[in-house]
From Swiss-Prot:
It comes from Escherichia coli. This is Glucose-1-phosphate thymidylyltransferase. It is an enzyme of class 2 (transferase). Catalyzes the formation of dTDP-glucose, from dTTP and glucose 1-phosphate, as well as its pyrophosphorolysis. Its EC number is 2.7.7.24. Belongs to the glucose-1-phosphate thymidylyltransferase family. Pathway: Carbohydrate biosynthesis; dTDP-L-rhamnose biosynthesis; Bacterial outer membrane biogenesis; LPS O-antigen biosynthesis. It holds the Pfam family NTP_transferase. Homotetramer. GO terms for biological process: dTDP-rhamnose biosynthetic process; O antigen biosynthetic process; polysaccharide biosynthetic process. It catalyses: dTTP + alpha-D-glucose 1-phosphate + H(+) = dTDP-alpha-D-glucose + diphosphate.
Length: 293
């Protein structure tokens, strides 16, 4: 089976969140008890992906390096690349071409939070897919804000539109995408900038769809997909995570726990990671976890 590498796109200027993001990347803001980027990072880890490229702005990349390092503390291999200007999501495959090499890849947006008991199982089918692409559809109340997928009676995707004025369905394409290695060449050779001057991920997905190689996995009831691009959605996401964690006593998107439970690191390493955090609830949670309660 081919290796699958991951990319987190954590660029952009975050203008919708000004003044909060005037001096700091949106993806470094807290979502309850963790930096935002922990959530998409955890999503890739839950898919079993350990080689991950983080793409950000020239000014923010050093901050991500300071926060996450080379990933070895979690049994990961993290690398970094700069996106000089926000020229579209699909530019990630051009920037990450050397990193991807001959492997398949997954892309997750740095401000997207995914939650659901069966999320690892849902991603497993996408990870194991030999060729083509998989995107994830989620029923939303305001589809005009997103890329929208339309289905026929058999559940096959028949159209994809970016932020349509008159959406043909309520199913938005989320910020999590799995592709075979063809995506690099598609991004480099087949894409032209859209009317807004960007290389659109929707155009990539449309090429796969027209080739009959696009799978759409449904995130149904019981899943949460949170897009944290506004002041209101930031606090809603924090409240959502807080409610689950306080009720269950279990953490959501805790990289240390995921790394431990997936066998990327051992209990001794968890202890090392918990040591500087032991005076707060996060560190105490890690120590309790390795004691088995």
């Amino acid at each position: 089976m081919k290796t699958r590498k991951g990319i987190i796109l954590a660029g952009g200027s975050g203008t919708r969140l000004y003044p909060v993001t005037m001096a700091v990347s949106k993806q470094l803001l807290p979502i309850y008890d963790k930096p935002m980027i922990y959530y998409p990072l955890s999503t890739l880890m839950l898919a079993g992906i350990r080689d991950i490229l983080i793409i950000s702005t020239p000014q923010d990349t050093p901050r991500f390096q300071q926060l996450l390092g080379d990933g070895s503390q979690w049994g990961l291999n993290l690398q970094y690349k700069v996106q000089p200007s926000p020229d579209g999501l699909a530019q990630a495959f051009i920037i990450g071409e050397d990193f991807i090499g001959g492997d398949d890849c997954a892309l997750v947006l740095g401000d997207n939070i995914f939650y659901g008991h069966d999320l690892p199982k849902l991603m497993e089918a996408a990870v194991n897919k030999e060729s083509g692409a998989t995107v994830f559809a989620y029923h939303v109340n305001d589809p005009e804000r997103y890329g929208v997928v339309e289905f026929d009676n058999n559940g096959t995707a028949i159209s994809l539109e970016e932020k349509p004025l008159e959406p043909k369905s309520n199913y938005a394409v989320t910020g999590l995408y799995f592709y075979d290695n063809d995506v690099v060449e598609m991004a480099r050779k087949n894409l032209k900038p859209s009317a807004r001057g960007e290389l659109e991920i929707t155009d990539i997905n449309r090429i796969y769809m027209e080739q009959g190689r696009l799978s759409v996995a449904m995130m149904g009831r019981g899943y949460a997909w949170l897009d944290t691009g506004t002041h209101q959605s930031l606090i809603e996401a924090s409240n959502f995570i807080a409610t689950i964690e306080e009720r269950q006593g279990l953490k959501v998107s805790c990289p240390e726990e995921i790394a431990y439970r997936k066998g990327f690191i051992d209990a001794e390493q968890v202890k090392v990671l918990a040591e500087p955090l032991k005076k707060n609830a996060y560190g105490q949670y890690l120590l309790k976890m390795i004691k088995g309660y």
